[in-house]
Amino acid sequence: MRTIVFLIVSILLLSSAVLMLAEGNAASHELQEYPIEESLEEQRKCVDGSCDPYSSDAPRCCGSQICQCIFFVPCYCKYRGK
């Protein structure tokens, strides 16, 4: 009975270790596809203030901000959830 429990626990631990390694490899592959230089370049192109969601030429809001427009008030960048 003990050997069966030991075998089952060993299989579970081994399978979870394999899944964790596979997940880590996938994450490192995603990081390689999206280099830091591109991320920094995108941050330089964003704006922290006014924005225009209807123009493709206008700079977009930075990071976790969204462009919000209310009737006649000019559009501005605001943090999500606030």
Swiss-Prot record:
Protein name (database record): U7-hexatoxin-Mg1a
Subcellular location: Secreted
Miscellaneous: When expressed in tobacco plants, the toxin induces a significant resistance to the insect S.frugiperda.
Main location as per UniProt: secreted
Lineage per the UniProt record: Eukaryota, Metazoa, Ecdysozoa, Arthropoda, Chelicerata
The family this protein is said to belong to: Belongs to the rTX family.
Keyword Signal set for record: yes
Signal peptide annotation: 1-26
Functional note: Induces flaccid paralysis when injected into lepidopteran larvae. Intracranial injection into mice causes awkwardness of movement and laboured respiration until death.
GO molecular function: toxin activity
Tissues where the protein occurs: Expressed by the venom gland.
Alphabetical keyword list: Amidation, Disulfide bond, Knottin, Neurotoxin, Secreted, Signal, Toxin
Propeptide position ranges: 27-44
Entry note about domains: The presence of a 'disulfide through disulfide knot' structurally defines this protein as a knottin.
GO CC aspect terms: extracellular region
Modified residues (Arginine amide): 80
Cysteine-cysteine disulfides: 46-62, 51-67, 61-77, 69-75
